[in-house]
Structures are given as structure tokens and as C-alpha cells.
From Swiss-Prot:
<protein>
    <recommendedName>
        <fullName>Zinc finger protein 706</fullName>
    </recommendedName>
</protein>
<dbReference type="GO" id="GO:0006417">
    <property type="term" value="P:regulation of translation"/>
</dbReference>
<dbReference type="GO" id="GO:0008270">
    <property type="term" value="F:zinc ion binding"/>
</dbReference>
<dbReference type="Pfam" id="PF04419">
    <property type="entry name" value="SERF-like_N"/>
</dbReference>
<dbReference type="InterPro" id="IPR007513">
    <property type="entry name" value="SERF-like_N"/>
</dbReference>
<keyword id="KW-0678">Repressor</keyword>
<keyword id="KW-0539">Nucleus</keyword>
<keyword id="KW-0479">Metal-binding</keyword>
<feature type="region of interest" description="Disordered">
    <location>
        <begin position="1"/>
        <end position="32"/>
    </location>
</feature>
<feature type="region of interest" description="Disordered">
    <location>
        <begin position="53"/>
        <end position="76"/>
    </location>
</feature>
<comment type="function">
    <text>Transcription repressor involved in the exit of embryonic stem cells (ESCs) from self-renewal. Acts by repressing expression of KLF4.</text>
</comment>
<dbReference type="Pfam" id="PF12874">
    <property type="entry name" value="zf-met"/>
</dbReference>
<feature type="zinc finger region" description="C2H2-type">
    <location>
        <begin position="39"/>
        <end position="62"/>
    </location>
</feature>
<keyword id="KW-0862">Zinc</keyword>
<keyword id="KW-0863">Zinc-finger</keyword>
<dbReference type="InterPro" id="IPR013087">
    <property type="entry name" value="Znf_C2H2_type"/>
</dbReference>
<feature type="compositionally biased region" description="Basic residues">
    <location>
        <begin position="14"/>
        <end position="25"/>
    </location>
</feature>
Length: 76
């Protein structure tokens, strides 16, 4: 039964190592993506990463609504 005990110890050691690496890494891709979405459409509440995309979205999805003042000088 020595191998069974070694296997359990190896699994515990590996789990501890994996947990340490996760803590060290500390980067969450979903959180980073969410932080990048800083522009929110006033009509449909869709979030966009930059003003150019925001203006393109607004012109294509809400053509009858007047452009917000923050998009007036943006080059699309």
C-alpha cells in the first residue's frame, strides 16, 4: 500500500502547489475585460471599450436619437 499513500501525498502536494500559483497569478480575465468597458450607451445600456466603437454603435443602432455631446467630436 505504499503507492496508495504516496499517491495521496502527491495529490495533496500538487493541490497546494496549484493553489500557490493561482494566488501568485492573481489576474482575472473577466474582471480585466469588464474594467475596459467604460462607455455605456444611454439608450440600451450596452458597454463599449472606446469612443469610436461607441459612436459607431450609436449611429447604427439608434439613428433617430440625437448624438450625445460626448460623441460630437469623435472621429468614427
Amino acid at each position: 500500500m505504499a503507492r496508495g499513500q504516496q499517491k495521496i501525498q502527491s495529490q495533496q502536494k500538487n493541490a497546494k502547489k496549484q493553489a500557490g500559483q493561482k494566488k501568485k497569478q492573481g489576474h482575472d480575465q473577466k474582471a480585466a475585460a469588464k474594467a475596459a468597458l467604460i462607455y455605456t450607451c444611454t439608450v440600451c445600456r450596452t458597454q463599449m471599450p472606446d469612443p469610436k466603437t461607441f459612436k459607431q454603435h450609436f449611429e447604427s443602432k439608434h439613428p433617430k436619437t440625437p448624438l450625445p455631446p460626448e460623441l460630437a467630436d469623435v472621429q468614427a
